[in-house]
Amino acid sequence: GDLVRRVLLLACVLAWGLRLSWHVGRRSAGKGEDPRYAELLRSGDAGPARRAVLFIFAPQALTLFVVSLPVQAGMIEPGPVGWLGWVGVAVWLTGLSFEAVGDAQMSRFKADPAHKGTVADIGLWRYTRHPNYFGDAAVWTGIFIIAAERWPGVLTIPGPVLMTYLLAFGTGKRLLERSMRNRPGYRAYMRQTSGFVPLPRWLSRRLARDAG
């Protein structure tokens, strides 16, 4: 494959992964096991080890394979990176910025004791309820665009589609909002703030009214 494209894809994935690992590690330090996984491992007739394989590790491995298809294809594609590839880099950079800024804003918000029990209606969170999830989807869409410039990269579109679906409709947004829905002020926040794609408040409110 083209050396520039290979290095570009590697750099994009590495930068995204290192930032996310640092953020999750710092946020989770000293807080014990993720309660979602703990509940999953306790429920059902199968033992914890079997449930971990069937419902955590195996699905994550399959998801990783599909989501990384653009990277796999991009590593073997011939031909130089053209204008579409650099559009992909711009989309990736936009997504990474949304993730990083959104996470930083939320961390600062939670660090203030005065905000305990309130809704983070600040910064990027005024335009989307999940700027970090939107950013994650944009990151992998950008990586797909870099790979889609050459054959067979265009065939790897299931990667960003699956990632976006999981974040917007699957295990990401849906599970989080299920636990947040009863927090004071959160339902009002949902009515005036876009659920995924960043939108101005007036448009989000109008769409919510039209949806009934």
Residues of each region from the PLM?
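Hydrophobic transmembrane alpha-helices
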Residues: G1-L20, V24, A52, L62-Q105, ...
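Active-site neighborhood of divalent metal-dependent phosphoester bond hydrolases
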Residues: L20-Y37
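Juxtamembrane helix-capping/reentrant segments at transmembrane boundaries
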Residues: G32-F55, T118-W125, G195
